[in-house]
Structure formats: structure tokens, C-alpha cells
């Protein structure tokens, strides 16, 4: 009986060996950063692809605080030094929707945050896809992404 189960498992897993790097690169792009996003005027080849971004949670706006329809929008910031005195900041927004994120983004910062909780000023890693454009407070264009997975880098 165990031999049959193993044989079925191997048959079901065999299509996974057919995937190669080119197949993966068609659905994901891990080379994109917040800086490269800020420089894009159009989605181009990134439309529909998964992006892996890291940055700091600069702001958190709760669009819907009810658990059943929870929605939060993060402003994700990255930056770089220009010389020794200037810093250039790059921003994008990431929206997370669904009750699975309700406990990940507490409205009030706990004294001892759990490992899965995301707080303001946390450095995070996000898997997301482009959802559109918005305008920042200073009038500059800003990419908005649909967040799929998030993890704190502590």
C-alpha cells in the first residue's frame, strides 16, 4: 500500500521537474527594487508578475478595520545615500486585503510584538504585483501594489 502511495505521489510531482528558470522568470521578477519602480513610467513587462521588495513601513493607513473585510495600505520606503550628505527616498504603496492580514497589522502597537506582526518603521519583505498608480502628497506619481505575502525582517 505504501508503495502505491509513493508511486502516486511521484507521478503527481513529476510535472514540477518540467519548470525551469525561464518559466519562473515569466511569473516573477526579483530584480526590481523600490528605486527601479520609482523610475518606471509604465508597467511594461512587470504587469501581472510577482515582485519581491524589501523596505521600511513609512506609514500605515487602515482602509477597512473590520476583520471580515480588512484592508490596509502601507507606504513602503527605500533609500540610498548620494555622497555623504544627501539621502534619496523612494516610495511605493502596498495594499493588503482580507481577514488573513487582520492580525498581521495591529492598529495599536503591542508592547511585545509577535514575530508575524507588522508595525510602523518595521523593515519588511513583500511579495506583490502591480495594481496601478497613485499620486503622492507632493504630486509625484507613485506605484500601488497588491500585497500577497509579507514578513518582518527582525
Regions found by a protein language model. Give the residues of each.
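Sec-dependent signal peptide recognition
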Residues: 2-8
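Hydrophobic h-region of N-terminal signal peptides that target proteins for export
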Residues: 9-18
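OB-fold and OB-like single-stranded nucleic-acid-recognition modules
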Residues: 17-154
Amino acid at each position: 500500500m505504501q508503495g502505491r502511495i509513493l508511486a502516486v505521489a511521484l507521478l503527481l510531482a513529476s510535472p514540477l521537474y518540467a519548470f525551469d528558470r525561464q518559466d519562473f522568470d515569466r511569473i516573477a521578477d526579483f530584480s526590481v527594487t523600490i528605486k527601479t519602480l520609482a523610475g518606471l513610467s509604465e508597467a511594461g513587462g512587470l504587469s501581472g508578475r510577482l515582485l519581491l521588495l524589501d523596505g521600511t513601513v513609512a506609514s500605515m493607513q487602515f482602509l477597512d478595520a473590520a476583520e471580515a473585510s480588512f484592508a490596509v495600505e502601507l507606504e513602503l520606503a527605500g533609500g540610498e545615500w548620494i555622497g555623504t550628505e544627501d539621502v534619496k527616498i523612494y516610495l511605493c504603496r502596498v495594499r493588503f486585503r482580507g481577514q488573513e492580514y487582520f492580525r498581521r497589522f495591529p492598529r495599536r502597537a503591542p508592547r511585545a510584538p509577535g514575530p508575524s506582526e507588522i508595525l510602523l518603521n518595521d523593515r519588511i519583505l513583500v511579495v506583490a504585483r502591480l495594481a496601478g498608480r497613485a499620486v503622492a502628497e507632493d504630486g509625484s506619481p507613485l506605484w500601488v501594489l497588491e500585497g500577497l505575502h509579507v514578513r518582518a525582517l527582525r
